[in-house]
């Protein structure tokens, strides 16, 4: 039974400008060198490299960002945090010592957006500055960025009280 579910994608215009900017440069180089047969740049790479970069960055990067999403689910047993297609993490509710919905500074506190941090202090975020900080029983902290932070914190607290009260 899922008590709370939220799915977020990168929707910032500047992220997509960078993604499509990199892709456009790769497409331009590919068309110049492979399709038109004109070496691209002052010191052009071999054709196989143009093919590789075109597939990775001209096609792969936009597809990757299209499918990249942060999914958060709260169930009676655990909190699931998935940064598809990169990683997923399951945090048992019994390991959560403290829950706090708060405003944070993604760049200052965690170095930006995405999957960030260290083994003791991890953040999963996509956009904005609202999130839920979990303090685990071993002292580690996990920040989950959310567009519905208060609702997420309430769902976690409710599940902890209802299903894990002593």
Segments and roles (model prediction):
Residues 1, 71, 131:
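A residue-level signal for beta-strand positions that form part of recognition/binding surfaces
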Residues 146-166:
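Cytosol-/stroma-facing membrane-proximal "stalk/adaptor" domains immediately downstream
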Residues 14-19, 39-45, 72-86, 141, ...:
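Short N-terminal helix-initiation segments at or just after the protein's N-terminus
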Residues 55-100:
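Conserved beta-hairpin
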Residues 42-60:
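Loop-to-helix transition at the N-terminal end of transmembrane alpha-helices
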Residues 10, 81-147:
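Non-transmembrane, membrane-adjacent beta-strand/coil modules in membrane-associated proteins
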Residues 1-45, 123, 149, 166:
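N-terminal membrane-targeting/pre-transmembrane regions
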């Amino acid at each position: 039974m899922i008590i709370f579910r939220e799915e977020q994608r990168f929707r910032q215009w500047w992220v997509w400008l960078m993604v499509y900017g990199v892709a456009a440069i790769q497409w331009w180089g590919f068309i110049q060198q492979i399709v038109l047969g004109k070496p691209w740049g002052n010191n052009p790479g071999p054709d196989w490299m143009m093919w590789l970069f075109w597939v990775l960055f001209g096609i792969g990067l936009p597809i990757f960002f299209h499918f990249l999403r942060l999914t958060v689910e709260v169930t009676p047993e655990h909190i699931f945090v998935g940064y598809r297609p990169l990683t997923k993490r399951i945090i048992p509710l019994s390991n959560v010592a403290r829950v706090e919905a708060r405003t944070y500074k993604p760049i200052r506190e965690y170095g930006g957006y995405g999957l960030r941090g260290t083994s003791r202090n991890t953040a999963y975020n996509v956009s904005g500055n609202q999130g839920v900080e979990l303090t685990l029983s071993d002292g580690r902290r996990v920040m989950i960025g959310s567009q519905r932070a208060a609702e997420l914190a309430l769902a976690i607290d409710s599940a902890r009280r209802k299903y894990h009260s002593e």
